[in-house]
Amino acid sequence: MKDYLYGFLILILILVTSCSEEDLSTEGRGLIINEFLASNDSCCKDSNGDYDDWVELYNDSNQPIDIGGMYFTDTPNDDKPYLIPSSDPNSTTIQPKGYLVIWCDDDQEQGALHVSKKLSKGGESIILLSQDKLTIVDSYTFPEQTTDISMGRDQNDFTNWIFFENPTPGLPNN
């Protein structure tokens, strides 16, 4: 029994020491909803020149994340969340420490990052679901919004959401 215990302790010691400091330090928050604009009249154009509502995702990990195959919705317990196409990984992959803007315009013909859900200025939820359609990757329920003023995470405290008079889609919040 004593030999078994020593063997077990040695195995644990090997496993713990085999994890490099870098492996432990790369534990980020992963994929997060970082900023959004629920009433875009004249702030930020998409590549087609349209002023559409948008949600910005941020990859806080050290690995690329492809959101293709994940689901997006604005309604908790939505039985028909929008499936983000997996056919264009060049468009749907977020590089490490990178940003990606999803346009909420119900105009999927404009590309993989244009979803069938629109955001309500009056307030609602933003929910990103994993490929199993059940696991919430990140979500935020927001209050009533002001036109052309975005809401996003405070860079000094990611748990705090604040308003931005100068929205920054695809860039760090300021």
Residue ranges and their predicted role:
Residues M1-T17:
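Sec-dependent bacterial lipoprotein signal peptides
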Residues C19-N174:
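Activation on beta-sandwich/Ig-like modules and their edge loops
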